[in-house]
Curated annotation (Swiss-Prot):
GO molecular function, one term: identical protein binding
Membrane topology listed for this record: Multi-pass membrane protein
Pfam families xrefs: Cg6151-P
Membrane spanning residue stretches: 35-55, 66-88, 113-133
Activity regulation, short description: Channel activity is inhibited by La(3+), which reduces Ca(2+) influx and thus inhibits it's function in promoting activity-dependent bulk endocytosis (ADBE) in response to high stimuli.
Function: Transmembrane protein which mediates synaptic endocytosis, fitness-based cell culling, neuronal culling, morphogen gradient scaling, and calcium transport. Regulates synaptic endocytosis and hence couples exo- with endocytosis. Controls two major modes of synaptic vesicle (SV) endocytosis in the synaptic boutons of neuromuscular junctions (NMJs); Ca(2+) channel-independent Clathrin-mediated endocytosis (CME) in response to mild stimulation, and Ca(2+) channel-dependent activity-dependent bulk endocytosis (ADBE) in response to strong stimulation.
Stored PANTHER family: CALCIUM CHANNEL FLOWER HOMOLOG
Keywords: Calcium, Calcium channel, Calcium transport, Cell membrane, Cell projection, Cytoplasmic vesicle, Endocytosis, Endosome, Ion channel, Ion transport, Membrane, Synapse, Transmembrane, Transmembrane helix, Transport
Record-given protein name: Calcium channel flower
Main location class: membrane
Family: Belongs to the calcium channel flower family.
Site (Calcium ion selectivity): E79
Length: 194
């Protein structure tokens, strides 16, 4: 068993279907899950640090810390439901979110990461919520899919749409059809010489 197979076996859930699809490389599928787990851990840790800022009477940092801890728990619930074995419905919730498109998860993570940074801008909220934001960005990139091959992009660029002529590539091709060349011999007939 190779190292990659061991890592994928550790990160895969029992009876997991492969919701992301075969077009994604294994390191992107499991790397995003690992990044989400690490992000959730640090979000909870630094959210607790922000909650302790109540000592300095900073209520906005207290609220930001609570939101950041909740976001960390939600990300941990969705990425590693094995951490919440004491709750019965965790696998149902995680499977329901796994069945949704990847852009749903990306939007959820990005949306959850922004309020703590706005409420209490500091290293703790920036790092904890920033990792969750980064996880959302990775899922968003996975939702976009991989880039088409060069042949497909060339074919799409050369297609005509709605009777339009393909782009001309010679030096005499102008932006406006039937444009007359500039004449420097005199003023244009409609010019008022003003």
């Amino acid at each position: 068993m190779s190292f990659a197979e061991k890592i994928t076996g550790l990160l895969a859930r029992p009876n997991q279907q492969d919701p992301i699809g075969p077009e994604q490389p294994w390191y992107l599928k499991y790397g995003s899950r690992l990044l989400g787990i690490v992000a959730a851990f640090f979000a909870i840790l630094f959210g607790l640090w922000n909650v302790f800022s109540i000592i300095t009477l900073s209520v906005s940092c207290l609220v930001a810390g609570i939101i950041q801890m909740v976001a960390g728990f939600v990300v941990m619930l969705l990425e590693a439901p094995c951490c919440f074995v004491c709750f019965e419905q965790v696998n149902v919730i995680a499977d329901k979110v796994d069945s949704k498109p990847l852009y749903f998860r990306a939007g959820l993570y990005i949306t959850m990461a922004i309020p703590p940074i706005i409420l209490c801008f500091g290293l703790a909220s920036l790092f904890g919520s920033g990792l969750i934001f980064g996880t959302g960005v990775v899922y968003g990139m996975m939702a976009l899919g991989k880039k088409a091959s060069a042949e497909d992009m060339r074919a799409a660029a050369q297609q005509t749409f709605g009777g339009n002529t393909p782009a001309q590539t010679n030096d005499r091709a102008g932006i406006v059809n039937n444009a007359q060349p500039f004449s420097f011999t005199g003023a244009v007939g409609t010019d008022s010489n003003v």
